[in-house]
């Protein structure tokens, strides 16, 4: 195993996912890439809000969101204490961007957490981990993060 992609979100359990994936990668002498995927804001708003006024995110909104994501990943990288860790921010569908990034960097394994997000998000986009598991052509290491 030469490259490991660790997909992180803003959930507090991401620390556990990052640490577990990093330890596994280092034990195998693999390079690590941390990934955060941002999504269009309309997925997080009420379906009834501005029903007829669908607008795409402005370039400024996307830039602000991406800066926040990059800062989040830089903080995770500092926590892991390895300057060789790469960081990647993508915008779009979670599962699709995770799979595309894994392909782009030629990852040998994807590391993700098993927690679910907000109930509305699960209805709208389904379980990201489940979708990546179904569509991935490389091993997926799932870190259980649900509280006992």
Regions inferred by a protein language model and the residue ranges of each:
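Structural beta-alpha unit
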Residues: 77-110, 147-148
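Short, flexible loop segments at boundaries between secondary-structure elements
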Residues: 138-146
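Glycine-rich, Arg-bearing micro-motifs that act as flexible, cationic patches
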Residues: 109-131
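General small-molecule cofactor/ligand-binding pocket signal
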Residues: 35, 86-90, 141
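A short acidic, glycine-rich active-site loop
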Residues: 54-68
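Small/aliphatic-rich secondary-structure junction motif
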Residues: 2-55
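Short, hinge-like loop/turn segments at secondary-structure boundaries
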Residues: 49-53, 104-106, 128-129
């Amino acid at each position: 195993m030469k490259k490991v992609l660790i997909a992180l979100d803003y959930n507090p359990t991401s620390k556990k996912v990052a640490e577990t994936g990093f330890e596994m990668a280092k034990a195998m002498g693999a390079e690590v890439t941390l990934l955060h995927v941002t999504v269009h804001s309309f997925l997080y708003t009420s379906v009834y809000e501005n029903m007829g006024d669908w607008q795409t995110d402005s370039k400024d909104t996307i830039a602000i969101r991406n800066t926040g994501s990059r800062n989040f990943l830089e903080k995770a990288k500092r926590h892991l204490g390895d300057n060789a860790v790469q960081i990647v921010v993508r915008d779009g569908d979670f599962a699709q961007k995770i799979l595309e990034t894994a392909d782009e960097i030629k990852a040998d394994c994807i590391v993700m957490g098993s927690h679910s997000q907000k109930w509305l998000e699960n209805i709208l986009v389904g379980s990201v981990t489940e979708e990546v598991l179904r569509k991935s052509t490389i091993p997926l290491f799932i870190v259980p993060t649900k509280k006992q």
